[in-house]
Each structure stands twice: as C-alpha cells, then as structure tokens.
C-alpha cells in the first residue's frame, strides 16, 4: 500500500529530525514572504506595509510547538500558494492556469494534513465569489480531484485497492 504525503512527511521528520527542522524553517520563510507579498500586492492594508510577515512568524512559532511541525508548515505553504493563485485568477479574462493550480493545492491539503479537509469548502466559495465560467469550474474540479485520484491510481498500481487510500 502507498502512504499519503502527510504520512511520508511524518516518517521523514521522524527519520531525519535535523533536516526536517531545516525544511520546516525554509517553508516558514517561504510562506511568510508569500503572505507578505500578497498583502502588499493586493493592498490589503491602507499603506504599503509588510506587517503580515512578522504576524505570520508569530503564528508559525505556535505551529512549531507541535510534534508534526513539518506537515503543519507544508500545509500552510500549500494554503498560501492556493490563496495566491485564487487571487491571480480574479481577472477579466480566463484564469484556467491559476484556478487549476489553486484547486490543485487545495486538493493536496487534506492529503498532507487531514485537519485541513474542511478547507475543501473554499473551492465552491471561491468559484462563486470570482464568478468563473463553467469551463473554469470544470478545470477547478479537475484540479481538486487530481491529487486524490493520482494517489488512488498509484496505490492501485502498487497492488492495493483503488479506493483504499480514500477509505482510510
């Protein structure tokens, strides 16, 4: 049977704790800079400030206290990437690439951190909020289902049941 990405990250953290801390630190820096860039680019504050970077750092210190810090930082990086791509898809023309990537990251979230499964509700809300066409909705649903279907296919190719990773 094939392990989920969250299980693989937990195994990596257990086997290589020093490398896991380094990777978690890099993920924390990447996510903090991404969140800071989002706030400046889309003018979420009245003046051009990078206040979101230290705010994310303070929140990330709380994430690092738990035992599965690598999966928590990977999930927060995926959420930041999904938010960035949802913001990019808000345009006058078609945003197939951005909405596909955003839904792909949202689809990966429950595989990395199962506590993020309720965030799957974000996709229909984002599609309705951004008033996307039916073609873009189809692309978004395909991006959402692609990680789960890929994991099921790889598990089936390894000799397990096709729906075994979803049933767990």
Map each language-model feature to its residues:
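TM-lumen/periplasm interface segments of multi-pass membrane proteins
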Residues: 1-29, 33, 38-41
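Transmembrane catalytic cores of multi-pass membrane glycosyltransferases
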Residues: 1-4, 136-168
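Aromatic- and kink-enriched transmembrane "portal" helix at the membrane-lumen/periplasm boundary
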Residues: 17, 53-73, 85
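Hydrophobic core segments of transmembrane alpha-helices in multi-pass, intramembrane catalytic enzymes
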Residues: 28, 71-83, 101, 119-123, ...
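Transmembrane-helix signature of polytopic, membrane-embedded enzymes
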Residues: 35, 39-60, 76-77
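Membrane-interface transmembrane helices that cradle and orient dolichyl/undecaprenyl
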Residues: 81-97
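Membrane-interface alpha helices of multi-pass inner-membrane proteins
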Residues: 98-112
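Perimembrane helix-loop-helix junctions
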Residues: 119-144
